[in-house]
Amino acid sequence: MLDIQLLRKDIDAVAARLKDRGYVLDVAGFAALEAERKAIQTRTEELQARRNSLSKQIGVLKGKGEDASGVMAEVSGIGDELKASAAQLDVVQAKLQDLMLSIPNLPHESVPAGRDETQNVEVRREGTPRTFDFPVKDHVDLGAALGLDFDAGAKLSGARFTVLKGQVARLHRALAQFMLDTHTLEHGYTEAYVPYIVNAASMRGTGQLPKFEEDLFRVPRKMGHSAEEGDGERVENFYLIPTAEVPLTNLVRDEIVAADTLPMMFAAHSPCFRSEAGSYGKDTRGMIRQHQFDKVEMVQIVQPETSAAALEAMTNCAENILRKLELPFRTVVLCTGDMGFGSTKTYDIEVWIPAQNTYREISSCSNMGDFQARRMQARFRNAQGKPELVHTLNGSGLAVGRTLVALLENYQNADGSVTVPTALRPYLGGQEVLKPAV
């Protein structure tokens, strides 16, 4: 969430920066709510001053033994007006809060301007795509003989679900463990195991709610009866996590942490659940776009002045996984029109997918600035001992399923077998090749 003072100070400048990312700020709507808020607050202050003045008069009149009933009646009436004003102010403040929650983050000055993904800027490319001397198969055809079962996934849960069995299931598990070990043992992250179901406050904290509820899997939960609701049973909405970023980042929600505890660096392996609303017809074949997929997530909680450098370091950590697996990749900085809602700057890492003859996103690393921290009220005590908002960052390190796809396709052999990258062999008992079932 943006600082509302930015809008109050220079809303036109904010609107111009948001326009760069394709967002049209409702300037008139904000101005109208602000005018209403100011009018109510001014009237409230006038009423409070009048009540204070009358209260003093009551004391004087009673001190003289004179009748104060008329003045007391007026004070009582002012009290009723103040209650009504407070209720009106609550309504306006709630509308302002809803508006602020719907506004995306401001792009960092270093982010290139652009309309969409076609105007993202490549910053580096590593590895050379392999030249095959046989017809390339995609991961669906390769995986069928190795344990990838899309039909079983569809039978159990519907489209965009997959069952992994045997060798490919072991490979999937090995990838996740390899990623976690690299981030914790080499990159300095602390491993965390987090809930896969979170409350609405957590989703609001990281920015999924209220704007992106249709992308989430909601889990209504009966919470018993409450006196206020009579005979009705209270139902509270919980949500399956779309990424471990949500629980990891919310660890500092409503906290004031000591400066010497920063940076906090967490890594977690979890399933992720996404409804993929709006993606009908996209990537319908295979594991590229699933309702449930595994990911190793990195999250950092840092002091504001270090977040820019932390983003570069986090992106390098994600790239290191691909370097170790010897998979060709490229890294792009997203332009203003392609950035995520809460990000101030994002790098996407794209891995080479031979069957598609292109690079596909496998990681997204973002600096959120104080955008999430303001929503969560996550703070630290600065050098002056005053609470200050932290900065938060998150990045995929990596999406396990997409890494599996890239590995199967890049390391395939003419006979349908798949060579295991050297870095993964210790996680598979030294196995060097995955051989298709006969």
UniProtKB/Swiss-Prot annotation:
Subcellular location per the Swiss-Prot or TrEMBL entry: Cytoplasm
Catalytic activity as recorded in UniProt: tRNA(Ser) + L-serine + ATP = L-seryl-tRNA(Ser) + AMP + diphosphate + H(+); tRNA(Sec) + L-serine + ATP = L-seryl-tRNA(Sec) + AMP + diphosphate + H(+)
Pfam families referenced in this protein's UniProt entry, alphabetically: Seryl_tRNA_N (PF02403), tRNA-synt_2b (PF00587)
Enzyme type, top EC level: ligase
Residues the record lists as binding ATP: R274, S275, E276, E361, I362, S363, S364
Residues binding L-serine, per UniProt: T243, A244, E245, E297, S396
Complexes and interactors: Homodimer. The tRNA molecule binds across the dimer.
Domain text: Consists of two distinct domains, a catalytic core and a N-terminal extension that is involved in tRNA binding.
Protein name according to UniProt: Serine--tRNA ligase
Gene that specifies this protein: serS
